[in-house]
């Protein structure tokens, strides 16, 4: 644990035009802030693994992937994603809502880190 505070921001960063630079053809969707805050942040509330994945008879690597995905930052901590396993292939889908596809990408990255990319293929 490094004691870092992290947050991704999708709207308010536009208020400070000098906070970022874009080249021609680039579009900014989100900004991730990482650093040591003036006050220590608090862990976000998290859903149970069974709320975001089919957790029946699954291997340990899948469980670790889901646990890692639950640590991923999501819009308003909604965790609107769902993982399932079928014949060694992992499916991930986004729920409804603003930024849910961005949330899904971040959750999938966390899933890969927790599960070990060598253990599965994406469906």
Place the predicted regions along the sequence by residue.
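Acidic, surface-exposed loops and disordered segments
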Residues: 1-123
């Amino acid at each position: 644990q490094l004691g870092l505070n992290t947050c991704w921001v999708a709207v308010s960063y536009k208020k400070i035009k000098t906070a970022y630079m874009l080249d021609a053809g680039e579009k900014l969707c989100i900004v991730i802030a990482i650093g040591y805050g003036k006050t220590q942040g608090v862990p976000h509330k998290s859903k149970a693994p069974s709320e975001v994945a089919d957790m029946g008879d699954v291997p340990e690597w899948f469980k670790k992937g889901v646990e890692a995905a639950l640590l991923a930052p999501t819009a308003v901590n909604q965790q609107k994603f769902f993982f399932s396993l079928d014949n060694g292939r992992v499916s991930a889908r986004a729920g409804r809502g603003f930024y849910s596809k961005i949330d899904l990408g971040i959750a999938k990255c966390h899933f890969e880190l927790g599960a070990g990319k060598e253990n599965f293929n994406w469906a």
